[in-house]
């Protein structure tokens, strides 16, 4: 938790941006693994609740009466039975005091607060809910059916939250740096362990254990797979094989709920083959190009398409692609190899604030998403970069057998793709290199003081260490 003043200042700015009405920010509740008496999944508080109210306990709601400048933390104190099973926790009053809030109330009072506001036709601002228990709570409080809540959520509040959370403060950057330290240890552990004979799940389990051992948790389920062509492939009991590539996409989340998100691709044997090195070097060049051009004022969509053109040019040199590069990228031919965007916002969420709808987070009135074209419709971040933004830089090249077959059968982008050559890469897998990047005053820099090896020689050298 940050200082009391941090949360006071954040709520003050939020009130100024929203202007009037009643703001309700729901914290999360415990989520059972399958049924409540059989245990709960690790608790994760709603990020916007954490941002403005700081408390990492279930069953809390923050209410801000903007017009009357009244802030209230709503929740019930635990009873003796809960204390017996789970131990004592701070009272709601104490938690409110820790973040500079003067008023508290039990959960049953929230219905009265909402009824009073509605009777006076005051605007009630809430964010789009993503959990069913919160959707049902909103239905009970405001009478808005769950199917309508996304549309009824306050755009004014969404835009205010996005504006504030998009630009990271100095203390937030410090937390992201802490997450990066743990992320470094997670990824270098994976590199040291990767060798023929182990299972994907074994390596992934060791990676997860690093996060836990530092008092953190994983920022998303760890991806460790020899099938790197599957974007979000789960680790399996497959045994690591000589000659294959292993892709590790993993990150840590600190005790204050700030994340890291990195991806590395490594040769199981410890040495890249010539063919692997050719593709890897293209991804490496695209990754480094982003670092050269990303800076305040630049549209990240422009960086994405510049990377696509660079990638396509280099794939033409290998005989995998052909034709005019500009026309090919305009037609979406690059999505055969890169069917996702260059990156996304990152912070308290790995895909930061995407619960507020990507069109509100990664885009704006100037830069709009293309939802029609395959691949381009997965571009999560397109708007102009600003100092203090944190984005991921994650180009990749994937050889997806089903996609190759589909496009070949349809003749899709046939004037730009050499399908005969692509057939010979169906067993290749995929390569992705991902880092977290802070936009600075005049450019950008990596988050994290120690670089996870990613240049081919550095990867091979690191994997060769005992």
Give residue ranges: language-model regions.
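Active-site neighborhoods and metal-handling regions in enzymes and metal-associated proteins
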Residues: 1-466
């Amino acid at each position: 938790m940050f200082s009391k003043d941090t949360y006071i200042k954040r709520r003050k700015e939020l009130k100024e941006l929203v202007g009037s009405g009643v703001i309700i920010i729901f914290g999360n509740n415990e989520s059972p693994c399958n049924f409540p008496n059989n245990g709960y999944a690790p608790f994760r508080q709603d990020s916007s609740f954490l941002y403005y109210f700081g408390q990492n306990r279930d069953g809390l709601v923050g209410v801000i009466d903007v017009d009357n400048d009244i802030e209230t933390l709503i929740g019930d104190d635990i009873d003796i039975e809960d204390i017996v099973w789970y131990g004592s926790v701070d009272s709601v009053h104490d938690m409110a005091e820790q973040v500079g809030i003067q008023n508290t109330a039990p959960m049953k009072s929230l219905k009265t607060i909402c009824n009073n506001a509605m009777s006076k036709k005051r605007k009630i601002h809430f964010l789009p809910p993503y959990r069913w228990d919160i959707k049902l709570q909103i239905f009970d409080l405001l009478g808005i059916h769950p199917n309508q809540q996304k549309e009824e959520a306050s755009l004014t509040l969404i835009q205010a939250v996005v504006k504030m959370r998009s630009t990271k403060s100095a203390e937030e950057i410090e937390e992201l740096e802490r997450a990066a330290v743990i992320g470094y240890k997670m990824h270098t552990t994976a590199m040291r362990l990767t060798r023929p004979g182990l299972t994907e799940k074994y390596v992934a389990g060791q990676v997860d254990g690093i996060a836990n051992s530092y008092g953190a948790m994983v920022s998303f389920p760890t991806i460790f797979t020899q099938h790197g062509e599957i974007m979000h492939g789960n680790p399996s009991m497959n045994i690591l094989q000589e000659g294959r590539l292993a892709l590790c996409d993993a990150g840590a989340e600190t005790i204050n709920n700030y994340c890291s998100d990195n991806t590395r691709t490594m040769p199981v044997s410890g040495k890249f083959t010539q063919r692997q090195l050719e593709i890897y070097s293209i991804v490496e060049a695209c990754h480094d190009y982003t670092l050269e051009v990303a800076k305040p004022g630049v549209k990240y969509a422009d960086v994405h398409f510049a990377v696509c053109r660079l990638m396509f040019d280099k794939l033409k040199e290998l005989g995998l692609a052909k034709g005019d590069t500009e026309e090919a990228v305009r037609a979406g031919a690059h999505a055969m190899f890169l069917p996702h965007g260059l990156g996304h916002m990152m912070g308290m969420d790995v895909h930061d604030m995407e619960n507020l709808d990507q069109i509100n987070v990664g885009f704006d009135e100037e830069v709009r998403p293309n939802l029609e074209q395959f691949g381009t419709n997965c571009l999560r971040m397109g708007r102009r970069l600003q100092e203090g933004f944190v984005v991921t830089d994650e180009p990749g090249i994937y050889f997806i057998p089903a996609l190759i077959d589909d496009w070949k059968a349809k003749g899709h982008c046939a004037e730009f793709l050499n399908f005969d050559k692509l057939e010979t890469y169906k067993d290749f897998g995929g390569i992705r290199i991902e880092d977290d990047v802070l936009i600075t005053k005049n450019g950008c820099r990596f988050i994290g003081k120690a670089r996870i090896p990613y240049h081919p020689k550095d990867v091979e050298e690191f994997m060769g260490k005992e």
